[in-house]
């Protein structure tokens, strides 16, 4: 399907599983064809205190999916008196993506869902068909081949959160330097049991980029 090519025209997002949580990172550039459409575009979103999601692809479709995820998370909490797990939410959105594809109205997005299943951190990659894969590390967008080069070389199972942050920043930075669809700096989010969803301060990220 020709529209799915849009998923590779801009953006680099990265997710890494660490010993005590999850790290999500993304650039801030939005492109439209060969034009830069935005330089401060949000690509990492809080769903609740212990789940975050990165988006690559159509900005409009991404916002619809994020709104749906937030609504489903709130509804689940009201019904069950506890927060939805990352696995349950990823499975739920997988069904939505698959159903939209079968109806020939696909959501042109690829997602990385990071968060917790009870006390265990987890990371999932979802594509527009609804395919869902649990990962130790993953990347999406046009800069993902470059980012994967860093991830595959530097990821270590059980690595600390601080080390995972550094690797995530280096992975996106490598795409900033080589992919024209990626640019305008890096946003980094950590999700831990102790602090929940936390976006790193700009100055902290800048130190890692320098």
UniProtKB/Swiss-Prot annotation:
This protein's UniProt keywords: Autocatalytic cleavage, Cytoplasm, Hydrolase, Protease, Proteasome, Threonine protease, Zymogen
Subunit structure: The 20S proteasome core is composed of 14 alpha and 14 beta subunits that assemble into four stacked heptameric rings, resulting in a barrel-shaped structure. The two inner rings, each composed of seven catalytic beta subunits, are sandwiched by two outer rings, each composed of seven alpha subunits. The catalytic chamber with the active sites is on the inside of the barrel. Has a gated structure, the ends of the cylinder being occluded by the N-termini of the alpha-subunits. Is capped at one or both ends by the proteasome regulatory ATPase, PAN.
Function: Component of the proteasome core, a large protease complex with broad specificity involved in protein degradation.
Name the UniProt record assigns to this protein: Proteasome subunit beta
Catalysed transformations (reactions): Cleavage of peptide bonds with very broad specificity
Record-annotated active site: 11
Record Pfam families: Proteasome
Annotated GO CC locations: cytoplasm; proteasome core complex, beta-subunit complex
Originating organism: Methanopyrus kandleri (strain AV19 / DSM 6324 / JCM 9639 / NBRC 100938)
Keyword Transit peptide on entry: no
